């Protein structure tokens, strides 16, 4: 029985693995001023691209701002796509499959009045 379970696990692992992916496209350009772009694609449906541009924010700060996307085919057969921007506001991914925060709820009027009252009548420290 144990050998059957081990054999079943081995067969499951072999069937679960995709064949080794082959890169069918790989483009990359690096410019002297710091900007770049790249794109890649493999034969198993994984692909991505990005473009980075050097951006001066003010006289003391500058950075490379990046915009890009990627996609892959999940084990469920669905294609998952993600786009993103990375700039002075941080990394900002967007995709249908990413979790979203709960909706904001308005503060009830009685709570707002209580907070206003407490602020107006609190002791100054």
UniProtKB/Swiss-Prot annotation:
Residues 33-102 form the Chitin-binding type R&R domain. Keywords: Cuticle, Signal. It holds the Pfam family Chitin_bind_4. GO terms for molecular function: structural constituent of chitin-based larval cuticle. InterPro entries: CHIT_BIND_RR_consensus (IPR031311), Cuticle_Struct_Prot (IPR050468), Insect_cuticle (IPR000618). The keyword Transcription does not apply. Residues 1-16 form the signal peptide. One of its GO terms (cellular component) is chitin-based extracellular matrix. PANTHER family: CUTICLE PROTEIN, CUTICULAR PROTEIN 47EF, ISOFORM C-RELATED. Component of the cuticle of the larva of tobacco hornworm. This is Larval cuticle protein LCP-14.
């Amino acid at each position: 029985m144990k050998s059957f379970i081990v054999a079943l696990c081995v067969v499951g692992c072999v069937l679960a693995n995709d064949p080794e992916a082959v890169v069918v496209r790989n483009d990359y350009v690096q410019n002297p001023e710091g900007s770049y772009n790249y794109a890649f694609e493999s034969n198993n449906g994984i692909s991505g691209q990005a473009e980075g541009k050097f951006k001066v924010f003010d006289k003391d700060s500058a950075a490379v701002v990046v915009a890009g996307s990627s996609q892959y085919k999940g084990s469920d057969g669905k294609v998952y796509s993600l786009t993103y921007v990375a700039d002075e506001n941080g990394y900002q991914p967007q995709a249908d499959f990413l979790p979203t925060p709960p909706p904001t709820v308005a503060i009830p009027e009685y709570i707002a009045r209580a907070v206003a009252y407490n602020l107006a009548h609190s002791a100054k420290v």
